[in-house]
């Protein structure tokens, strides 16, 4: 049965599997992309694998940073990932609670200071990300409860609000 476009049978089966063996909750996510050198192409592209196949995603810097602005920039993709993750978590929590949503939209916004990226300052690139959720289908108090649970459970929110170790590796060919 689907609620809010969430397959509750699949989600419940996975939750039961994880309850029996917590290692089943661990999923590796990886993308590999390439910088595109020929003019006229977006600067970066990657093929993302998913359960139904693959999707090519392209990014391009805005003109003021030397790109052509042909595609969304990397920060927009970060915000998209956060908004999509939060929406998926919100819809799933609502479904768990038996709430059938009639509307759900999520906006993710930040202000970017590019001085450090340009090498002419050390100001933080961003100091705030704002998520705005517009939802209907239940009482305000129930939607607030769902929003709080989504904030607690969303992997994208966790990535922004907790220190995560970053490793970089350079391979010279």
Predicted regions: what they are:
Residues 79, 85-87:
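Compact, glycine-rich, soluble single-domain proteins
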Residues 1-80, 92-173:
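Extended beta-strand/beta-hairpin segments
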């Amino acid at each position: 049965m689907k609620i809010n476009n969430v397959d509750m049978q699949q989600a419940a089966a996975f939750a039961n599997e994880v309850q029996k063996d917590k290692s089943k909750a661990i999923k590796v996510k990886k993308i590999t992309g390439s910088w595109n050198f020929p003019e006229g192409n977006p600067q970066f592209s990657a093929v993302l694998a998913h359960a139904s196949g693959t999707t090519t995603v392209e990014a391009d810097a805005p003109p003021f940073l030397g790109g052509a602005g042909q595609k969304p920039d990397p920060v927009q993709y970060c915000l998209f990932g956060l908004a999509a993750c939060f929406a998926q978590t919100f819809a799933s929590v609502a479904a768990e609670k038996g709430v059938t949503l009639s509307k759900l939209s999520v906006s993710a916004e930040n202000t970017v200071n590019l001085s450090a990226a340009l090498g002419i300052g050390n100001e933080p690139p961003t100091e705030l990300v704002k998520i705005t959720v517009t939802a209907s289908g239940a009482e305000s108090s129930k939607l607030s409860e769902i929003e709080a649970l989504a904030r607690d459970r969303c992997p994208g929110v966790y990535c922004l609000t907790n220190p995560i170790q970053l490793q970089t590796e350079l391979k010279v060919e």
